[in-house]
């Protein structure tokens, strides 16, 4: 997804019907705002995050150690229509403190949005991702994400909520609830500052105890201009189960 600053949906969620670890790492730290590449345009977004201070133990046997590990992925997107964007994440990669440089798999994405979301006071969408995972990246070979997008604009302030469900195909009750939230202030048409929160409450059948949940708060600066769009941030863990200090960088550019 380019970085810029209903009934069928419910049926799809039930059909896709799991928990993932609250300590699981991610290649993408981003709140979706329902913006997509224009019709006929290819976009490339580079996602990277580095855990400066985090867990020194793997989330499961054979997994990567989060601390001092770089995770990232190129995201290749194409605007199919004014309401649908297709995406491919390839390759997911890490340079880890315990396994060195590794490839983690790939993801396919289908993003459906309200057209021209950037010009509307209320906007919405939904994103579906399907992942093939290396054994060191996720305990499940196949997983997916269901990400609804809900947002409001109040002048120069945007409020966006992504109530994400992560799915490892182990039953509906084991879907993992991992929402993300963003509030930003648009200083100009090119610059914005934001606070983003990324949470993982655990499986919807029974949330994890508070001390085992992951909650991170990021301070973010966005630049939307030439030659590339940039989003950089620093994140702080709010619970003992969260990585304590994480840096993220997102670079995005239309290719045609």
Language-model regions, residue ranges each:
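Bacterial N-terminal signal peptides that target proteins for export
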Residues: 1-10
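Transmembrane beta-barrel domains of Gram-negative outer membranes and organellar outer membranes
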Residues: 23-256
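N-terminal signal peptide c-region/cleavage motif recognized by signal peptidases
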Residues: 19-21
